[in-house]
Regions:
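Subset of outer-membrane beta-barrel
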Residues: 16-319
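Sec-dependent N-terminal signal peptides
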Residues: 3-13
């Protein structure tokens, strides 16, 4: 246990993240609950959004599930996601999902650093998922993803990739999960410069995640996830995530998490404080009619580098 605590601490302090690479717009989080728990959901049955966390979790689907997320963020950024999951008897599930991440009102500049027109950039990810259980302990799942990117009107990219995930049930309170993301993933860009069209390939970093979800404490769930990211240049970076969820008497849930705040820094850079960014949020069921409820989740992102507050909302329901 002491070694595990030291390992977690060291990974948080020296961790790196995937910003600045192809597909980084998909890493922020698909829902408010995911963000408030620091993204440590690779082994958790997230209602309405499990396709984004781990396709192997689809085998836990017992009814039709829908998840919708609206995230209007500072600096004209936004993320929207939709997820649909359906049970396939006796022990499988299928899902469809889409996520869009974008930024508006980007100020353009020419080679002389003079302001030109404003433009927008966005990334879209469409996912088809399937998960199946093999007995009572093990489940496997796959994602097939189509990705699209647009920067203004002259820069467009697309590609196809996949994910493979697993879930292992140690007991009814402890789940172990893992996923390999962005297998064979890249953008095939087409760029228009004047009257010429040029093409090139930009590869995604590969990501390997392993985590657990524990619900053996009364009214408390604990989550842990360790990510290993391998960049196109074969640099290896680490990312540790920890989350906790507290269930109150009125079915309201308080959520807290912690993840890295910064990536690697140049030699000689002075770092003030630990490399940790706290996350938090809340969730509550809302009655729609009779016995039908929808789950409302909220998370607040205070920002990492002074970019301002961002408010994240998600809705999920079963039918």
């Amino acid at each position: 246990m002491r070694f595990l605590v030291i390992l977690i601490f060291v990974n948080i302090v020296i961790a790196d993240y995937g910003g600045g690479y192809a597909g980084s717009g998909f890493q922020y989080g698909s829902s408010a609950r995911e963000f408030s728990l620091a993204g440590a959901l690779v082994a958790d049955k997230t209602p309405g959004f499990c396709v984004f966390s781990n396709p192997a979790l689809l085998q836990f689907t017992r009814s039709n599930q829908v998840g919708v997320s609206f995230q209007n963020m500072s600096l004209d950024r936004s993320i929207q996601s939709f997820n649909y999951a359906k049970r396939l008897p006796p022990n499988a599930g299928v899902g469809l999902a889409i996520l869009q991440s974008g930024t508006d009102n980007i100020q353009g500049r020419n080679l002389m650093n003079q302001e030109t027109e404003s433009f927008s950039a966005k990334e879209i990810e469409g996912i088809m998922s399937f998960g199946v259980a093999f007995g009572s302990k093990l489940a496997l799942g796959i994602n097939i993803k189509a990705v699209f990117a647009t920067i203004d009107k002259d820069y467009k990219g697309n590609g196809i990739s996949g994910d493979i995930g697993f879930i292992y049930k140690l007991n009814r309170h402890l789940l172990i999960g893992g996923i390999m993301k962005n297998l064979n993933a890249s953008y095939n860009w087409k760029v228009i410069i004047g009257e010429d069209e040029r093409s090139y390939e930009e590869k995604f970093p590969r990501s390997y995640s392993l985590g657990m979800a524990y619900s053996g404490l009364k009214g408390i769930s604990l989550f842990f996830q360790e990510d290993v990211m391998i960049t196109p240049n074969n640099d290896v970076n680490y990312h540790t995530r920890i989350g906790s969820e507290f269930r109150l008497a009125n079915k309201t849930k308080l959520r807290f998490g912690a993840k890295q705040a910064r990536g690697t820094t140049p030699s000689g850079t002075i770092m003030n404080g630990l490399n940790i960014k706290p996350t938090f949020g809340i969730g509550t069921p809302l009655k729609v009619w009779q016995r039908q409820y929808t789950q409302l989740d909220y998370a607040l992102d205070p920002g990492s580098v002074g970019e301002g507050l961002s408010h994240l909302f998600s809705f999920s329901f079963k039918f």
